[in-house]
Structure formats: structure tokens, C-alpha cells
């Protein structure tokens, strides 16, 4: 997968799971991330159609997929599935796909939702969407740092 670069256009982030996929999208300048929706997974064909619709409606130019790693940085049981999903997206949509370390995003998303006093029932889908926002915002912030030129003295 590719490293962050300076491509303009909206970026779609996915918090990939076996039952749900949380989605977030950037603004056109690639500065901020907003939660979009949570897709309930059914099968590859249905998932593909739903993602194609999101990509077309939002004029997506790049995709970021959360990479589930262990706290140590080692691969988890879900890491290979996420990599396979990212490769599938890259093949299906012919768009650049980046993998992004998603450690702590679900923990942080759950903390934020608990503090907002959202009911446990509503948290299920919201946590995936918020995790996608956190993945995308971290990606965008890193890209912004990489774009900055050194200060001249």
C-alpha cells in the first residue's frame, strides 16, 4: 500500500470489520474528517455496490483502511483480512489505498461516545463511524505535517 502523499480531492476512510464498515470522508482540501455512515456487511457484491455509490457520490480520490495491529505493533488476527480488503479495494476501484495504524481508535471512540451519554444500543454503529473519523483525521494530520516546508531563518 502507499504512503501519504499530496493528492487533492476527498479521501474515504474505512474502519473495516467482519460485520460492519465505518466510513468517514475528508473535506475537498483534505484537512478535516467527518463521519459518513456505517455499512452493515452482507456479501462482497453488496459491499462493493454500497462502496461504489459512496465513492461516486463523494468524488473520492483516495482510500484509507484502518490496520488492526496489536499494542506491540505486531499483526493481529484481523490484520491480514484488512490487508486483503485494502488490496481488493485498490483492484476494484483503481484508487490509491493507504493502510493506517488504527490502534486505540475503537477505545477512543467508545470513550467519546460514553462521555456523550449515547445509549449502548446506539453506540454499536456509531463506534465504527467514529473510529473511521479518528483514522482519517490522524492520516490527514500526518499528511499535513509531511507537506509542510522547513521554516527558513
From Swiss-Prot:
CDD domains: YqgF. It is an enzyme of class 3 (hydrolase). Keywords: Cytoplasm, Hydrolase, Nuclease, Ribosome biogenesis. The keyword Cytoplasm applies. It comes from the Bacteria. Its EC number is 3.1.-.-. GO terms for molecular function: nuclease activity. It is found in: Cytoplasm. InterPro entries: RNaseH-like_sf, YqgF, YqgF/RNaseH-like_dom, YqgF/RNaseH-like_dom_sf. GO terms for biological process: rRNA 5'-end processing. Its main location: cytoplasm. GO terms for cellular component: cytosol. Could be a nuclease involved in processing of the 5'-end of pre-16S rRNA. Belongs to the YqgF nuclease family. NCBIfam families: RNAse_H_YqgF. PANTHER family: POLYNUCLEOTIDYL TRANSFERASE, RIBONUCLEASE H-LIKE SUPERFAMILY PROTEIN. This is Putative pre-16S rRNA nuclease. It comes from Koribacter versatilis (strain Ellin345).
Amino acid at each position: 500500500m502507499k504512503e501519504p502523499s499530496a493528492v487533492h480531492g476527498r479521501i474515504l476512510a474505512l474502519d473495516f470489520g467482519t460485520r460492519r464498515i465505518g466510513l468517514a470522508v475528508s473535506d475537498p482540501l483534505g484537512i478535516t474528517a467527518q463521519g459518513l455512515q456505517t455499512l452493515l456487511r452482507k456479501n462482497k457484491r453488496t459491499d462493493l455496490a454500497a462502496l461504489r455509490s459512496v465513492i461516486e457520490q463523494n468524488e473520492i480520490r483516495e482510500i484509507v483502511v484502518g490496520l488492526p495491529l496489536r499494542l506491540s505493533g505486531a499483526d493481529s488476527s484481523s490484520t491480514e483480512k484488512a490487508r486483503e480488503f485494502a488490496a481488493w479495494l485498490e483492484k476494484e476501484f483503481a484508487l490509491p489505498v493507504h493502510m493506517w495504524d488504527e490502534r486505540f481508535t475503537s477505545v477512543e471512540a467508545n470513550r467519546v461516545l460514553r462521555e456523550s451519554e449515547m445509549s449502548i444500543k446506539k453506540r454499536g454503529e456509531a463506534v465504527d463511524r467514529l473510529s473511521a473519523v479518528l483514522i482519517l483525521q490522524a492520516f490527514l494530520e500526518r499528511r499535513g505535517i509531511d507537506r509542510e516546508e522547513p521554516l527558513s531563518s
